[in-house]
C-alpha cells in the first residue's frame, strides 16, 4: 500500500479493544493528545515521542523511498520496512540467474549488502507550524490566479525565504517541504535530511513477503511476511553522501528495540509513520466524484493493462522480473479502487455524508448564519464544473502516463492555463500532453 509524505500518523489504541483512532500531527501531541495518552497507559514523556530540538522517536521512524515508513532497528542504520516497499529494489537486483524476487535475499556480511540506485531514507529533523508566516507572504505577494495558497512551486519559494530568515542550516542533503493542511488553513514546514546510500540487506521470498498477493491486498487480517531490510550508509563522520565504497553504516541517533517479554491485553500501543492523506472532510458530491472518476478509471483501465502485462510476464522469466514492480504498483491501487467503491456502497457512505451535511447546515441556520450554506453551495458548484476536467485528466494519467509509460503529463497549472486560453477540456488535455 502506498504512503505519501503529507502528515505523520499517530493512532492510539489498547489491545483490549478500545481505540482512539485518527491522525494527529506530532507537533500537536502535547496540546491535543498528551492527557489521553497518559490515561491510556503511555509511560514515557511526550517529548520522547516527538521533540524538534532533542532526540526522540522521530529519529527512529523514517520516510523510506518515495512513500513508505521505515524503522531504524539497530545502532548501525539497519532499516525495517514492508516487503512491498522494498519490492522495486529487490527487483532492481534480480535476474533470471539470481531471482531474488522468487528466492529471497540475505547478505551474510556487510560486503554482500547491495547498493540500491535511487533509494533514499529521509529523517524528519523538525516540523514547524509556519501558518502566520505563510499567510503574510500570501497577502503581500502577487497572485493573479488566486492559486498560490496551494501551489507547490510557490510554497517552495516561501519555504526557502523562511529558512533564510530563521537561519536554518541547509546542505546538499537537506530538503524543505512546505505543505498545506486542513484545506490550507494551516501550513507546516518539514525540515528533512536525506541519505542516498542505502543498501539491501535482506528480503524473504515473494511466496512469504507477498503471500496472498492481490487477493489479500487491502484486506485484514493478513497472513504474509510483509518485510524487508536495508541499511543506511554515510561518510565516516556520519554525513549523508552519494554511494561510495568508503562509506560506512550510519551511527544513528536512536533505534527501536524489541521487548522480548511480549505484550499482554490492555497494553498501550500507538503507530507512528507516514500514512499519506485522508478525505474525511469531503462532501457527498466529492465522494461521488471520486467514485465516478478516479476509482472508475483506475479499475477500468488498469484491468486491461494488468491483463496484458500478466499475459507477457507468464511467457518469460526475464519479462516477469522486468515488470514485476510495475505490475505490483499498478495492481495496488487497482485493488484499492475496486474495494473502496464496494465499501462506500456497502456502508452507505453517501447517505451518511448527506446526513452529516444537513446536520451542519441546520446548525448554521440555528446560529443565524448562512456561512455554512454558502460554503457548501460553493463547493458543490466547483465539483460540478470541474467534473469533465477531472475525468479527462484521470484518463490521461491512467492511459498515457501509466499505460504507455510517458514521462510527463500536463500539470494542473497547464490545464488551467489552456482552459483560460479557450481550449475545450478534451482538446486542452490532449494538446498539453505533448508540450
Segments from the language model and where they lie:
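Sec-dependent N-terminal signal peptides
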Residues: 4-13
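Sec/Tat signal peptide C-region and signal peptidase I cleavage site
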Residues: 15-19
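A conserved glycine-rich beta-strand in the N-terminal activation segment of trypsin-fold
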Residues: 59-76, 255
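Catalytic-histidine neighborhood of serine endopeptidases
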Residues: 80-124
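Short, Lys/Arg- and Gly-enriched loop/turn segments at beta-strand edges
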Residues: 89-92, 276-286
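Long, charge-dense accessory insertions within large macromolecular proteins
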Residues: 145-232, 238
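Charged, amphipathic alpha-helical linkers/stalks
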Residues: 290-376
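Conserved small/polar residues in nucleotide/adenosyl-binding loops
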Residues: 434-435
